[in-house]
Swiss-Prot record:
Keywords: Bacterial flagellum, Coiled coil, Secreted. InterPro entries: Flagellin_hook_IN_motif, FliD, FliD_C, FliD_N. One of its GO terms (cellular component) is bacterial-type flagellum filament cap. It comes from Bacillus subtilis (strain 168). Its main location: secreted. It is found in: Secreted; Bacterial flagellum. Belongs to the FliD family. This is Flagellar hook-associated protein 2. It holds the Pfam family Flagellin_IN. Homopentamer. The gene is fliD. One of its GO terms (biological process) is bacterial-type flagellum-dependent cell motility. Residues 448-471 form a coiled coil. Required for the morphogenesis and for the elongation of the flagellar filament by facilitating polymerization of the flagellin monomers at the tip of growing filament. Forms a capping structure, which prevents flagellin subunits (transported through the central channel of the flagellum) from leaking out without polymerization at the distal end.
Length: 498
């Protein structure tokens, strides 16, 4: 309100009088402003709920519990991990195997035997490279310029598709340490070769780098690459690398068994790993449902309405904080969207799942609802019972959680698909009321109400300005009349004195 200089003749504090008169006039505006604030708080509270729901949605989108293969996860133990370790894919059968390692796979090495120094120049090198275990050669081209030193050449060899790790150092030749260039193949296994594809390349490799080549211009290996030789359950086999897969089990061999004897590996369902994933999901679900139940039961303090600016000025910051905490409480109490969502999620968990001609009930797997009323919908796990089910029937656990498709009948859908759909529909229901950060206010119900109230507030402020101006006009007229009366009285007094 603008301060106006009035009441000079009457001596009255007209600003104060008008201010008090306007307090009554402004009461409806304060009600509208409070209503607007309440709606804004409610909108924000709804959006906080959706943020929590989306946290679970994000978790589920990244979690592998939605995939049937998760429930077929395997764990593999080795009786001697200093010799070999192993992991199992879902295709690995639960079984035990005896493994003997006769030799490890090694990489071929190449050593120059006549390196006397490098002469810089322009060289276009071409090689035919056969990887261990392959029969088809791959062509590799390397361009060397006159600006390249021997270190640059070695760097280019290493970064090319030649498949070697090259270096230059002093190496013992039997009598002394001699500066030498050497290659080590990046791939283990027998049968690989590096061939100079033309005479210029052959001359470079022998003349500049000092390597020996055979009649076919292939580099002569210092040590040939070898295959790993293993025996699994009596079956002898050779492998190109020390990491290989047999019957769904991937072995990583580190040493031979000559000194230690055979190693036993055991493949079994990864009960602990599967259980921990289910428990983590249940914990995340419980966090959400507990939060939603808290909103549904939150106390509503009807005597605590949003504060006006005048009320805030009369209170300390702490008093305002405590007041608004109660004013915001209970804004979503018994909300239909939230209660529908929580009720449906309980139904999703406890309605039996039909799959493979069988029916599956959550309680059969050791997962039940808490008996505490205040924790309605909160899930509890009987660890022993669930682990036993995972061990004896992992496919049944997979069916319970992942059965069906998005187009399946409700009874044929697993729990993860049901919960996914319920979370999605709950978010949409809440967004219809409170929108989201990307939606315009006219796209959701609270936003429409806020727009309407904002229009009412603007109109009412215009009316109040008109009323205030009218009050000032009346008091100004009264003050002018008093001033005239005072002037007339003064004139009469002067006449009487004469």
């Amino acid at each position: 309100m603008v301060t106006r200089i009035t009441g000079l003749a009457s001596g009255m504090d007209i600003d104060d009088i008008v201010s008090k008169l306007m307090q009554t006039e402004r009461a409806p505006l304060d009600k509208l402003t409070q209503k607007k604030q309440t709606l804004e708080w409610q909108r924000d509270s709804y959006r906080e709920v959706n943020s929590k729901i989306k946290e679970l949605q994000d978790y589920m989108s990244k979690n592998t519990l939605t995939y049937p293969s998760t429930y077929q996860s395997k764990t593999v133990t080795s009786s001697n991990e200093s010799v070999l370790t192993a992991t199992g894919s879902v295709s690995a059968p639960n079984s035990s195997s005896t493994v003997e390692v006769a030799s490890l796979a090694t990489a071929a090495t190449y050593k120059a035997n006549n390196y006397t120094g490098y002469t810089q120049g322009d060289y276009n090198l071409a090689f035919n490279v056969v990887a261990p275990g392959e029969t088809t050669a791959k062509t590799v081209n390397i361009s060397v310029t006159s600006a390249d030193t021997i270190d640059n050449v070695i760097s280019k060899l290493n970064s090319s598709d030649l498949g070697v790790s090259a270096f230059k150092d002093k190496i013992w030749n039997g009598t002394e340490y001699v500066e030498t260039i050497a290659f080590s193949s990046k791939a283990t296994g027998a049968g690989g070769s590096i061939q100079a594809a033309d005479s210029a390349t052959a001359d470079f490799m022998s003349g500049q780098l000092g390597f020996s080549l055979d009649a076919d211009n292939k580099l002569t290996a210092y040590k040939e690459g070898t295959n790993a030789k293993v025996t699994i359950n009596g079956f002898e086999m050779e492998k190109l690398t020390n990491n290989f897969t047999v019957n769904g089990v991937t072995y990583s061999i580190k040493n031979t068994t000559a000194a230690t004897g055979p190693v036993t590996t055991s493949v079994s369902t990864d009960v602990d790993g599967i259980y921990n994933q289910i428990k983590e999901f249940v914990d995340k679900y419980n966090e959400l449902v507990d939060s939603l139940n808290e909103k549904l039961k939150e106390e509503k303090y009807r005597d605590y309405t949003p504060l006006t600016s005048e009320q805030k000025e009369a209170m300390s910051d702490k008093e305002v904080e405590l007041w608004e905490e109660k004013a915001k409480s209970g804004l979503l109490r018994n909300d239909s969207s939230i209660s529908t969502g929580t009720n449906q999620m309980r139904t999703d968990f406890y309605t039996q799942v039909n799959a493979d001609g069988k029916t599956y009930q959550l309680t059969e797997f050791g997962i039940t609802t808490s008996s505490a009323y205040q924790l309605r919908g909160h899930l509890e796990i009987n660890e022993e019972k669930l682990k036993a089910k995972i061990a004896e029937d992992p496919q049944g656990v997979a069916n319970l959680f992942t059965s069906g498709t998005n187009d399946s009948n409700y009874s044929d859908k697993g729990i993860m698909k049901r919960i996914t759909n319920t979370l999605r529909s709950t978010v949409k229901s809440i967004e219809a009321k409170a929108g989201n950060s990307t939606m315009g206010a006219s796209s959701y119900s609270i936003g429409k109400n806020l727009n309407s109230i904002s229009t009412e507030i603007t109109d009412m402020q215009d009316r109040l300005n008109t009323i205030e101006n009218r009050y000032y006009s009346k008091f100004s007229a009264m003050d002018s009349a008093i001033q005239k009366m005072n002037e007339q009285a003064s004139y009469l007094s002067q006449l009487l004195v004469q």
